[in-house]
Amino acid sequence: MAEEAGTATGRAPERTDPSGPTRAATRRRGPLAALLAFLVLAALVLLVPGGEPPEEDCRPLRVSDWRPENALTEEFARYGDDNSRLDDWTGGDGSRSLPLPDGRTLWLSADTFLDEVQEGRSRDPESVWVRNAGLVMSRDGRLERTLLGDGPRAWFPGLATADGREVWRWPLAGVVEPRTPGSAEQVVRVLLWQREAGQEPWTFGVPRATEVATVSLPDLRVESIEPILDPADADPAARVLYGTAAVPEGRWTYVFGADERTAHGRASTAHVARVPAGALADPAAWRYWDGERWQTSAARSAPMALGRTAERGATNTYTVARHGGTWLLLTTDAGGPDGRGLTTVTSYWACGPQGPWHGPHDVLVPPLPPGSDGRALAYNPQAHPSFGDEGGLVLGYDVNVPQEVAAVHRDVALYRPRFVRLDLSVR
């Protein structure tokens, strides 16, 4: 290849030829083309910190259009309204998905209602609910059953503090990987956030720890829950929990996390770790990006740059997906385009999981259910790559009315996931 680029020594003498001027011009362009190629490659390498080679087909990626993905939204409504069982999912948030090897899809849900839906519209204000659940979707896209603990209780069981306060687990991203590195047996690994009951601004729980659950295949039985990281920060807002996204790529799984500065009205800082395939449940195998290289100490993790100010950037539940050779990060903008807060989904792109991330680019204001009258909030945008295609990506988001809990009982649509399909293009 070096010789073809004209960098080898000992060239044969040049010969006079009727096409000489053209050939001479070609010879002059040869070194210039090589120089330009080198500069382009150098620029791409700079796009991927740490000296890692860029993705060969990395391109600046933007969302060019979107439309409602009604089939998925309606499937969750159908399943939730089905009263053939009164101990399964009728609404929830924290909705994430992962494809299983046999063609099924495992959906993960955080706070989940289990109850009867009355006339397809409302639920009893005293409905039973649990801190987490799983949902199994068939190969043909039909939700079939809810995964719970005995009781019914949460699928991933909770704990309690020494003084009796509730400690619960919220499931986040999940992946299918070897049971151990190199093993032929596959299991599901689910990232969990451990949280405990607290007061304002921690009404949604004080962040405590990152854990990983191992779930068997194909029967989806919770086998174990392993502690991964227990942040030592005295300020809960500075504690980084991992798992808002997990992307397998080659020999590694890249796990994304964030602190919780959004509790104080600021953007969260985004972090990334990587783990060898098959080792997610082994805390000793985790490596944390410090801005230049991968470190064994989570305390040395450095935030990835997102947004232009501390008030605009990611929330703690952003999502990351790969599309071709480009990494795409989507989040509810912590600042919003006009400073109004969590209203707009924005995107960033990068040539590697560590960034640098380019953006933000406004994507959409997620549509809310009819009749929400401006009370409802859309949050937790999550990519569902297995439902996308070459030209696009399915994005789900949750809906809630945090200032009026009774509203989600009067109208069950106000606490169910909704979906849109994003068209992606190179910009």
PLM features: residue spans?
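Secretory targeting and sorting signals
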Residues: 3-4, 26-51
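N-terminal regions that are enriched for targeting/export leaders
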Residues: 49-185, 190-194, 206
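Surface-exposed loop and turn segments in beta-propeller and other repeat-based domains
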Residues: 75-84, 135-164, 227-237, 285-312, ...
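Conserved blade-ending motifs and adjacent loop-strand segments that build the rim/top face
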Residues: 86-87, 355-387
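Structural signature of eukaryotic scaffold interfaces centered on beta-propeller domains
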Residues: 90-101, 161-186, 197, 236-252, ...
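Beta-propeller blade signature
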Residues: 120-143, 203-220, 269-278, 344-353, ...
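Long, hydrophobic, well-ordered secondary-structure blocks that form the structural core
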Residues: 173-274
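Active-site cradle of extracellular carbohydrate-active enzymes
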Residues: 247-352, 361-368
